[in-house]
Amino acid sequence: MAIKYFKPTTNGRRNMSSLDYSKNLTGHEPTKSLMTILKKKAGRNNSGQITTRHKGSGEKRKYRLVDFKRQKDNIEAIVKTIEYDPNRSANISLIVYKDGFKSYILYPKGLKVNDVIVSGEDVDIKIGNTLPLKNIPEGTFIHNIEMQPKGGAIIARSAGSSAQILGKDDNGKYVVLRLKSGETRRILAECRATIGVVGNEEHSLVNVGKAGRNRHKGIRPTVRGSAMNPNDHPHGGGEGKQPIGRKSPMTPWGRKALGPKTRKTNKSSTKLIIRGRKKRINN
């Protein structure tokens, strides 16, 4: 999908870019039976307190019901459309099974309209097909990966993401994957995945350009703690541009930041990680 750049007619448009959806999408209206109402919570809980900062309502939109399980085995499906989904960075495709059942799936790179895809235990290694990890050869790039059998995919679902199969363990119970983050981990061999890489990989190259586009997405501004009052943040207060007045940076709730690990120590999946993700190096 090509990137469209704008002329610098205003300050907000000077560095703005967007994806040219006319190059790849089929332009069909979304299927009403596969949409549902999406309620906006704007980061609040049932009592109205902010539980997640920097979240707003954004544009009104409906949620597309995407099939992350792909459990209709050995029934061929035809790809009918390639559509935009406002709720995720990846595009989606409408597929129609031979028995007439319709569903949305994540659009993998290289899939075309009228292509035939299928799910099952021993289906072909072809873009868009879904099968257990134990039946996928080494070196294959996959996406839409489950962590528990029949639990639905939760890994490699965003635009341009994928994982690569490195091998299988000695007893065949686990398959070793290398994720996009650089993390190497084991996944149960019975879990399913889809062949290919998630499409719309140019999504990360888009320059938002102005704050208003983020507000449409439901992203509110991020304010520095040192610009707040002392009753709002541990870094707040002081006359003019003062230091934070602490030995180390603090979170808004008074805990130390930039140091302590934030991952839960009692997660059962931690023991399946062979090598952690690559650390970012700030230049």
UniProtKB/Swiss-Prot annotation:
Keywords: Ribonucleoprotein, Ribosomal protein, RNA-binding, rRNA-binding. The keyword rRNA-binding applies. Gene3D superfamilies: 2.30.30.30, Nucleic acid-binding proteins (2.40.50.140), Ribosomal protein L2, domain 3 (4.10.950.10). Residues 215-283 are annotated as: Disordered. GO terms for cellular component: large ribosomal subunit. PROSITE patterns: RIBOSOMAL_L2 (PS00467). SUPFAM superfamilies: Nucleic acid-binding proteins (SSF50249), Translation proteins SH3-like domain (SSF50104). The keyword Membrane does not apply. Transmembrane segments: none annotated. One of its GO terms (molecular function) is transferase activity. One of its GO terms (biological process) is cytoplasmic translation. Residues 274-283 have a biased composition (Basic residues). Belongs to the universal ribosomal protein uL2 family. Part of the 50S ribosomal subunit. Forms a bridge to the 30S subunit in the 70S ribosome. One of the primary rRNA binding proteins. Required for association of the 30S and 50S subunits to form the 70S ribosome, for tRNA binding and peptide bond formation. It has been suggested to have peptidyltransferase activity; this is somewhat controversial. Makes several contacts with the 16S rRNA in the 70S ribosome. This is Large ribosomal subunit protein uL2.
